Curated annotation (Swiss-Prot):
Pathway: Amino-acid biosynthesis; L-arginine biosynthesis; L-arginine from L-ornithine and carbamoyl phosphate: step 2/3. L-citrulline binds at Y87, S92, N123, R127, S175, E259, Y271. This is Argininosuccinate synthase. GO terms for biological process: argininosuccinate metabolic process; L-arginine biosynthetic process; urea cycle. Its EC number is 6.3.4.5.
Length: 400
């Protein structure tokens, strides 16, 4: 029986060439799988047909936008997920859902292996292959770009030689990845960490230095998940899409950072994530209003670790599942509305309210109606500072 390989297919040069490359190198039949996670751009039916033209025996397109939002973006919002306190895991979140569908397709079509188009310098190779190890350890993984020396020049020559329907005349200077949660750009002039990113690299966001009227949004949350915008109940997909448009129009969500990659190198990355930054800003602020202090403090460490393991390709790990259990529990009661002003590239919280607010005006006010008994403070300070006082007395005794 002829071997079958399921290829993570984007419709671009590398994965289109990989269809024929895999067939020529291994004799296997290739099943192309494109997963729609809200990346936009080219029509997915055109991509599906291109795979057939390039030699695939089967071509599948999966609309996974709702699943991506509900099962991957939503947990990231609850976990305030920002790798290195800045990057909202745009690509990191999309890889495990692609792996999930690759494995399902492999089982359905009797495939022996899956394939991806990742290089050996990036994080995605780890995310794909460790994900496969977790879900289907018996499947082999083929990585033609990394393992077979399939350079861009060789890929172009391969495509031209076989007349593949791929336009390679307009080579973008950037490597782009995008989905519902944001857009990433690297390579080209961006590899110089001193060089200012040219404006043509940005697509999701307007220039934040240009003066324009501000916008204001009110985001509603239920148990830590966004459920409405400006009083309208919306699905998470629609809510994120609208915020990408409105916050992006105000230049919100541009990130220029030096990132520590999993493989050990530093890279310069440009991200555009207007909805992600707006939602994470609002969610964290609502947590400050509703979470008990020790839970909030502990959760910050959990959130950081959650972002790290997802970035590192361990979505399917038992640790992430365990962290999710804490995050889900802590999120109960994180319900309310957050009002955000969008202007000049900044999403600024200007108001928040919650039926479960722990803010007590009668305790916080310095005006009439203050119910905080300030005479309690002296005894509290004496007890709170007692360990420090005892330690200081010992130090003075031993080191007069």
């Amino acid at each position: 029986m002829t071997e079958r390989v399921v290829l993570a297919y984007s419709g671009g040069l590398d994965t289109s060439v990989a269809i024929g490359w895999i067939g020529a190198e291994t004799g296997a039949e290739v099943i192309a799988l494109a997963v729609d996670v809200g990346q936009g751009g080219e029509d997915l039916e055109a991509i599906r047909q291109r795979a057939f033209t390039c030699g695939a025996v089967e071509s599948i397109v999966v609309d996974a936008r709702e699943e991506f939002a509900a099962s991957f973006v939503a947990p990231a919002i609850r976990a305030n997920a920002l790798y290195m306190d800045r990057y909202p895991l745009i690509s990191s979140l999309s890889r495990p859902i692609i792996v999930k569908h690759l494995v399902e397709a492999a089982k359905q079509h009797g495939a022996d292996a899956i394939s991806h188009g990742c290089t050996g310098k990036g994080n995605d190779q780890v995310r794909f292959e460790v994900g496969v190890m977790a879900l289907a350890p018996g499947l082999r993984v083929l990585a033609p770009v990394r393992d077979s020396g399939m350079t861009r020049d060789k890929a172009i020559a391969f495509a031209e030689e076989r007349g593949l329907p791929i336009d390679v005349s307009k080579k973008s200077p950037y490597s782009i990845d995008q989905n519902l949660w944001g857009r990433t750009a690297e390579c080209g002039v961006l590899e110089d960490p001193w060089a200012q990113p040219p404006e043509d690299v940005f697509v999701y966001t307007a220039d934040p230095t240009v003066s324009r009227p501000s916008d204001e949004v009110t985001i509603s949350f239920t148990d830590g998940l966004p459920t409405g915008l400006d009083g309208r109940a919306l699905s998470l997909v629609d809510l994120v899409a609208e915020l990408n448009t409105r916050a992006g129009a105000q230049g919100v969500g541009r990130i220029d950072m030096i990132e520590d990659r999993l493989v050990g190198i530093k890279s310069r990355e440009i991200y555009e994530c207007p909805a992600a930054i707006t939602l994470l800003t609002a969610h964290r602020d609502l947590e400050d209003l509703t979470l008990e202090r020790d839970v909030a403090r502990f959760k910050r460490g959990i959130d950081q670790r959650w972002g790290e393991i997802v970035y590192d390709g361990l979505w399917f790990s038992p640790l992430r599942a365990a962290l999710d259990a804490f995050v889900d529990s802590a999120s109960v009661g994180v319900t309310g509305d957050v009002r955000i002003r969008l202007a000049g590239g900044v999403a600024q919280v200007v108001g928040r309210r919650s039926p479960g607010s722990l803010y007590d005006h009668a305790l916080a006010t310095y005006d009439a109606g203050d119910q905080f008994d300030q005479t309690d403070a002296r005894g509290f300070i004496e007890l709170w500072g007692l360990p420090t006082k005892v330690w200081a007395a010992r130090e003075q005794r031993l080191n007069p």
